[in-house]
């Protein structure tokens, strides 16, 4: 019996490098689908931001966008907001205070991390209760309790799967909840040290090459050999 039936992948810094998914990485993901397993794409990007760099949504069973706020079924062309949107009062005030560029999604906003203190002050001045999630050089502004974990949980429920059956792979701070939630959390070699420190496995190769490496292990023996060797956090894939 297959233990890990779902692979949940972060986008930037994981399957993609500077917004580009290499053909070899895409081929590896297609192998996962052909094996009968399910694929989730999990990203802080809005739909518009993702569309500008990556059009192969059909490879995935579900997309978790906006850091867990929006769930998309690409085959059916349907989407569900998983939370109430951030207050509309915030956008004009952020722009008035010079927070540009400001990406506006269905439920969240995103900006450069250099604006972090201004964003915090603005939220406080408006009396709003929101979460801020830093992702390397960006910050996502989102409703309380929304994360990649909550988004993946919704996606798994929608496809009739469980966290125990899921392998999640990522590289940055906003991936931490998802990796902890999954049955097996994997960090790519280029991931932040804090991510690699808590991952069950760490790939030997970076980004998309590391994902292809992970796929090889997943399809070979359901990661049994890698997890047997691991015996603890952060063991390297072979």
Outline where the language-model segments fall.
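Short, well-ordered beta-strand core segments
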Residues: 7, 32, 63, 185-187, ...
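Hydrophobic "anchor" residues on beta-strands that sit immediately upstream
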Residues: 6-8, 62, 167, 196
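Active-site phosphate-binding/coordination module
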Residues: 18-104
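Conserved acidic, metal-coordinating active-site core of Asp-based
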Residues: 87-182, 186, 190, 196-198
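Asp-based phosphoryl-transfer active-site loop
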Residues: 2-19, 179
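Asp-based, Mg2+/Mn2+-dependent phosphohydrolase catalytic module
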Residues: 1, 181, 186-238
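Hydrophobic/aromatic beta-strand patches that form the interior of the parallel beta-sheet core
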Residues: 40, 64, 167-169, 186, ...
């Amino acid at each position: 019996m297959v233990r890990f039936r779902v692979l949940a992948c972060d986008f930037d810094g994981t399957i993609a490098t500077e917004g580009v998914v290499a053909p070899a990485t895409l081929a590896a993901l297609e192998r996962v689908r052909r094996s009968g397993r399910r694929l989730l794409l999990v990203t802080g990007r809005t739909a518009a931001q993702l569309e500008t760099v990556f059009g192969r949504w059909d490879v995935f069973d579900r997309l978790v966008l906006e850091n867990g706020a929006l769930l998309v079924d690409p085959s059916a062309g349907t989407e569900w907001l998983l939370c109430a949107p951030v207050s509309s009062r915030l956008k004009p005030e952020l722009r008035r205070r010079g927070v540009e560029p400001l990406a506006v999604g269905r439920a969240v906003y995103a900006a450069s991390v250099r604006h972090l203190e201004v964003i915090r002050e603005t939220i406080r001045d408006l009396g709003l209760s929101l979460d801020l999630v830093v992702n390397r050089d960006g910050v996502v502004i989102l409703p309380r309790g929304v994360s990649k974990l909550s988004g993946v949980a919704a996606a798994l429920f929608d496809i009739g799967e469980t966290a125990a059956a899921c392998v999640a792979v990522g590289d940055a701070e906003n991936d931490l909840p998802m990796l902890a939630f999954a049955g097996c959390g994997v960090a790519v070699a280029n991931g932040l040290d804090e991510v690699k420190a808590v991952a069950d496995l760490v790939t030997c190769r970076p980004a998309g090459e590391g994902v292809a490496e992970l796929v090889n292990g997943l399809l070979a023996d359901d990661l049994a050999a890698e997890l047997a060797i691991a015996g603890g956090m952060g063991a390297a894939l072979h």
